[in-house]
Amino acid sequence: MESIKILRQNPEWLESAVCWFHQKWKVPVEAYRESMRICVENVKAIPQWYIVADSQQRLVAGAGVIENDFHDRPDLSPNVCALFVEEKFRKKGIARYILNFIRKDLGSMGIETLYLVTDHTDFYEKCGWRFLTMVHDKEGFAERMYCASTYQ
């Protein structure tokens, strides 16, 4: 398995990461660029971005940690967001590896709990996340909020 690149330690990957996440999630390029720029320039824990590249240096997986993933509970923060693994790299443990890496990295920064919204409930429960509550997105639709302790 390829190793995880922490964007704050690998700023040369910023533009590639911006384009890759935009392609996967259709969030505006500028929103990703701003968040990743803050990640690279800032010494604070949030936001953070993580990427995985294959042997040809193509991005194949990644995730971020932001204050709020477009829901109505700003008190449930920070949020893991945008976890994605390219189809041909799935079922190899990469997503679980990224999630555990994030839990360790954020734990080392003093963050105790992480949150995320998802409809992939079985996967996250198998990864040690637990259902916390329902939240609502910007359009008012209910979403399941999960939480997990970091590794400190």
PLM feature spans:
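Active-site rim helix/loop that mediates acceptor-substrate recognition in acyltransferases
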Residues: 26-51
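Residue-level detector of beta-strand face positions
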Residues: 51-52, 115
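Helix-adjacent hinge/juxtasegments
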Residues: 69-77, 81-82, 92-94
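Short hydrophobic/aromatic beta-strand or adjacent loop that forms the aromatic wall/cage
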Residues: 47, 140-146
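Conserved acetyl-CoA-binding loop-helix of GNAT-fold acetyltransferases
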Residues: 82-85, 91-104
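A short beta-loop-alpha structural element at the N-terminal edge
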Residues: 1-17
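Conserved active-site alpha-helix within GNAT-family acetyltransferase domains
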Residues: 108, 112, 118-142
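Conserved beta-strand in the GNAT
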Residues: 51, 58-68, 79, 84
